[in-house]
Amino acid sequence: MNISKRFVLASLAALSGTTGLAGMASAEEINIILCGDVVTPVYTKLFEEWNAANPDYPVAPELVGWGQCQDKVTTLAVAGTPVDIAYVGSRTLKQFALNDLIVPVPMSDEEKAGYYNFVPETVTFDGQQWGIPVAFSTKAFFWNKDLFEQAGLDPETPPRTWEEQQAFAKQISENTDAAGFGMIAKTFDGTVHWFLHWIYTNNGQVIDADGNIVLNSPQNLAALTAFKDIVPYSEEGPTAYEQNEVRAIWLDEGLAMMHCSVSCANRGTEAGINWGVAPLPVGPDAQGPGTLLITDSLAVFKGTGQEDKVIEFGKFLTSPENQLAYELSEGGLTPLRPSPEVDAMIAEKPHWQPFVDGIEFGGPEPLLTDYVGFQNVMIEMVQSVVTGAAEPQAALEKAAAELEQYK
């Protein structure tokens, strides 16, 4: 094994903590690791359907808590005792693939065309797909209409640009007891996701289609500068807050504006907030509304001896009809594919519209050789600017240079 491969495998193993090892999957079963504490009713029904049609390959699900799920999957794969198929963050696929731990899951052109823009790209590198998208998350802009009104702003008019967002945040901070804007900058993966939303609302990129690191660009400098400029009008000490903690402040009406998933709609209503939702404000180079496009995927692991049948099972679970049933049952997942049923859902619940509108000009979560390394570099960059330890240009240059080792 060469040095670079040992290093990356060590990085993968470091993710795994002290999770115990399980035995190799038996040939007659399809072992699947799902994250959470319950098998959803939709999956229970689909497993029963599969078992009836494929009695020689019954499904054996294993539930692992969200905090340990990725770690256990990684531990089993690195140890050479892989599960057949597992729920993973798509950001890990490149690292798994380069270490020969998973197999490609090719998509036909017809399959690719069935998804929203860029969804296949979240699982693709070197021209191959390495996972099957199974969950999709996008973000939109939420605001507290009552706090807008208290600050002298039109409660029905959200900011459309970064410039307006900062001006509104300043006006709210100066005229109410609330912070203007909710900023996420804690040492947590959500900080990376959150800044990527800024990159993708200004036509920026981290790594291009040819595998070049392009973080140090005018578009991303504008994003990091706008990020810095809104700090004075955000909650105090943003490096102490991750997204759920910022959401809690918003729900307590301690801040007026934040970027959030669709979950903020129901939570806001339950909290009695007079809220609105719109596409994320955009930067000067934006071509339209954008957002980070995050997917989780089903990865098929190498070495089980039944990879082809497992791929068939994964595609059964995520067929358009079955995937839509899963998404609608979960309630907080952005649909992976457009359909008449999705159109009907948006017509019934118009607050979904911004979460779909941002897809067209959004961008996928970057696939790098060491996602933890990437995450650490990005968090350090963001925090150095938020705290004033570095200026945006210097922080961007430093981060771009450090990312070269992970491309």
Task: Give short role names for the model-derived ranges.
Residues 83-84, 112-147, 179, 287-289, ...:
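A structural signal for short loop-to-beta-strand junctions that line the ligand-binding cleft
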Residues 130-134, 139, 164-212, 255:
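Extracytoplasmic/periplasmic solute-binding protein
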Residues 52-53, 58, 149-150, 155, ...:
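Conserved C-terminal helix/tail region of periplasmic/extracytoplasmic solute-binding proteins
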Residues 41, 94, 262-276, 283-380, ...:
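C-terminal lobe and pocket-closing loops
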Residues 46-118, 124, 150-152, 249, ...:
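Extracytoplasmic "Venus flytrap"/periplasmic binding protein-like
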Residues 166-171, 210-239:
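Glycine-centered hinge/linker elements that transmit conformational signals in sensory
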Residues 103-117, 158, 181-185, 202-222, ...:
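Short, solvent-exposed loop/beta-turn-alpha elements that line the ligand-binding surface or hinge
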Residues 90-140, 166-168, 174, 194, ...:
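Hinge/lid segment of periplasmic solute-binding proteins
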